């Protein structure tokens, strides 16, 4: 902890120093970190997740022994949060960074620097200057408003008129362990212009470099991606308002979260794009919320019209590459097959729902997929044309094996032992409509019928992905010992057959803001950590 205080000061020097106007402009960048007292139980909780509970407990107890009721931890107050602010100016290298360390006792803090860190702070009026090894510029700090307020290079940054008052800064409480906010609408226009100009030059240099073995289609794709970046990045920087990142670990809910949010300036094209991501309908969900989902993915994403239109010649080149690289005997079929799926790819829209669900008995699983098609009946024609000619050694294809609500269902039975081992069946059921493909791996076809009869998802988010940690490994590692899995499940959950609280979820939502949230339950991380440790023994 003694090193932590000076580490924060040294960390600030990496950002350079800033200049502010007399009226104290609001910070461009704000960072708030919870108090030591709040961080200690979080540290112990996270250590336990990674199967290091004893080490975490000892670390917390050690830090508590360093805490004094009057002087805190070497002068640092463990009951109040830490902070940093940056007010960006046109001259970026001269922009001040202000670091705020909660102060318990001035003398104890100076003793930390002089006696324990072997530094020599020198005082001029109320400002201290200290040379820190491996830091090219001097560090300045003063005691004010109950905090150690520090900066680098320019002592004038510490004048009260040059930075947001500490009380005002911490009126906004940290929303998690750490809370970072970047106000894009406060970035000086000149800085944005310079950043964009440098980015464009760098991008042009990279795109101009030849790539060994690159096909015509691959080159067109690379150039297309570069062109889209030169459109998207300026929009984000010029029309963006706030970008925030919040990290949290909550022992009560047993959850680790990373929450990223991005908002746009009102009335901009970017704000309209974000708003359009909300309140859309999508294909029916193929899994129930209360099902034993191993993996569930739902997506509704699409390229903007201009990007989609510019992608068409790129797609043509990629498909041509694919055909040319195939064996001569396969090209005829490939051309027909690619022509059938090309309209769907050209639409550049991903509207899908997929799931891998375990049966209640744990002995079988169901795979389900539903995705949007464009001119899907062309694919249906291919199935009817080539399906009956599937070699018997590979399996059996049955056209019109079943039907529900006017939807024809075909059945494909593959001679695949691995498929049967994992899912308890080798039967694949599929239905192809002009606007939709539905597919399941299941014994009797009951699930595909339910999906085809289901109503559309009225609130389709751009992306949601949910996984269950204790059920995933057997599907991704065929050599994993089933007995080892049971042992680890029992160690983490008590009863391996009733493992709960081990989900991992990623969600992307739109509306007033674009929000990317990653939530992992602690038991999920612990299960994977213990499994990794046990597998290496």
Regions found by a protein language model. Give the residues of each.
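One face of beta-strands
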Residues: 27-31, 82-84, 97-101, 139, ...
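A conserved glycine-rich beta-strand in the N-terminal activation segment of trypsin-fold
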Residues: 131-209, 422-500
């Amino acid at each position: 902890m003694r090193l932590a205080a000076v580490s924060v000061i040294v960390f600030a020097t990496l950002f350079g120093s800033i200049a502010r106007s007399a009226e104290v402009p609001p910070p461009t960048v704000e960072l708030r970190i919870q108090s030591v007292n709040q961080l200690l139980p979080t540290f112990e909780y996270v250590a336990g997740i990674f199967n290091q509970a004893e080490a975490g407990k000892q670390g917390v107890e050690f830090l508590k022994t360093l805490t004094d009721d009057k002087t805190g931890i070497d002068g640092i107050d463990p009951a109040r949060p830490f902070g940093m602010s940056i007010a960006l100016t046109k001259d970026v290298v001269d922009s001040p960074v202000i670091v705020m360390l909660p102060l318990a006792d001035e003398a104890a803090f100076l003793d930390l620097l002089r006696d324990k860190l072997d530094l020599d702070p020198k005082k001029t009026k109320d400002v201290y200057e200290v040379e820190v090894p491996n830091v090219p510029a001097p560090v300045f700090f003063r005691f004010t408003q109950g905090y150690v307020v520090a900066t680098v290079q320019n002592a004038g940054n510490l004048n009260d008129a040059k930075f947001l008052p500490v009380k005002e800064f911490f009126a906004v409480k940290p929303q998690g362990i750490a809370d970072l906010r970047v106000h894009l609408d406060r970035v000086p226009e000149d800085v944005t212009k310079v950043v964009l100009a440098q980015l464009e030059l760098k991008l042009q240099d990279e795109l101009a470099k030849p790539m060994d073995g690159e096909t015509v289609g691959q080159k067109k794709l690379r150039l297309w991606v570069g062109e889209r970046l030169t459109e998207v990045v300026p929009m984000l920087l010029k029309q963006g308002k706030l970008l925030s990142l919040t990290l949290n670990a909550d022992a009560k809910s047993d959850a680790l979260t990373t929450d990223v949010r991005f908002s746009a300036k009102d009335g901009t094209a970017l704000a309209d794009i974000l708003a359009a991501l909300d309140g859309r309908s999508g294909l029916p969900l193929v899994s129930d919320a209360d099902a034993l989902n191993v993996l569930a993915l739902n997506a509704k994403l699409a390229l903007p019209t201009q990007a989609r239109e510019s992608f068409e010649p790129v797609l043509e080149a990629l498909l041509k590459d694919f055909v040319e690289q195939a064996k001569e005997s396969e090209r005829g079929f490939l051309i027909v097959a690619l022509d059938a799926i090309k309209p769907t790819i050209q639409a550049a829209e991903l509207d899908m729902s997929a799931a891998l669900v375990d049966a209640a008995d744990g002995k079988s699983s169901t795979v389900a997929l539903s995705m949007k098609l464009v001119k899907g009946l062309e694919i249906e024609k291919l199935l009817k044309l080539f399906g009956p000619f599937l070699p018997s050694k590979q399996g059996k294809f049955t056209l019109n094996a079943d039907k529900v609500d006017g939807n024809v269902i075909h059945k494909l039975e593959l001679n695949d032992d691995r498929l049967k081992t994992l899912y308890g069946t080798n039967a694949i059921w599929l239905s192809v409509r002009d606007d939709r493909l539905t597919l399941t791996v299941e014994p009797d076809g009951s699930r595909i019928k339910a999906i085809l009869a289901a109503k559309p998802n009225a609130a389709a988010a751009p992306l949601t992905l949910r996984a269950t940690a204790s059920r995933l490994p057997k599907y991704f590692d065929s050599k994993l010992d089933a007995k080892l899995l049971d042992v680890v499940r029992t160690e983490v959950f008590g009863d391996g057959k009733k493992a709960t609280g081990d989900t991992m979820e990623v969600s992307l939502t739109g509306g007033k803001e674009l929000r990317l949230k990653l939530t992992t339950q602690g038991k999920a991380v612990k299960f994977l950590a213990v499994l990794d440790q046990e597998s290496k023994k």
